[in-house]
Amino acid sequence: MPPKKAAASSAKKGQKTRRREKKNVPHGAAHIKSTFNNTIVSITDPQGNVIAWASSGHVGFKGSRKSTPFAAQLAAENAARKAQEHGVKKVDVFVKGPGSGRETAIRSLQAAGLEVGAIADVTPQPHNGCRPPKRRRV
């Protein structure tokens, strides 16, 4: 019986691991999309290319806990930490959606060390477009 080979390293043989290059972007934009079910924070460069992102689900919350302000706070801190590795120091904030994590996410971006410039609400308003979902009866 031949001897067993030692376990291979975590990287597969012949496969290159892609190295993420560090961009140097001092000023960016933070897009906070806060829905009733989740909060997504994306930090972009001035052209709109995403540098860092995080969401309540990505941070580790599941189900109804994703929609809490605390989950939005952790998602914003996580995205801010990743963006600071790319040199982001100042952001303009664009908030979209009706969710509960809007204000908390903005506050935690400031607390994480990013300087917040302008804050704009870019929630899309329908000109009587799609029919909204029916009322819940609990």
Curated annotation (Swiss-Prot):
Q: What does this protein do?
A: Located on the platform of the 30S subunit, it bridges several disparate RNA helices of the 16S rRNA. Forms part of the Shine-Dalgarno cleft in the 70S ribosome.
Question: Which PROSITE patterns does the UniProt record give?
Answer: RIBOSOMAL_S11
Listed InterPro entries: Ribosomal_uS11 (IPR001971), Ribosomal_uS11_bac-type (IPR019981), Ribosomal_uS11_CS (IPR018102), Ribosomal_uS11_sf (IPR036967)
GO MF annotation list: rRNA binding; structural constituent of ribosome
* A Pfam family: Ribosomal_S11
Q: RNA-binding among the record's keywords? A: yes
Q: Which NCBIfam families match?
A: PRK05309.1, uS11_bact
Its GO CC terms?
A: ribonucleoprotein complex; ribosome
Protein name from the UniProt record: Small ribosomal subunit protein uS11
Low complexity: bias regions: 1-12
Subunit structure of this chain's protein: Part of the 30S ribosomal subunit. Interacts with proteins S7 and S18. Binds to IF-3.
Some GO term, biological process aspect, for this entry: which one?
translation
- Provenance organism: Mycobacterium sp. (strain KMS)
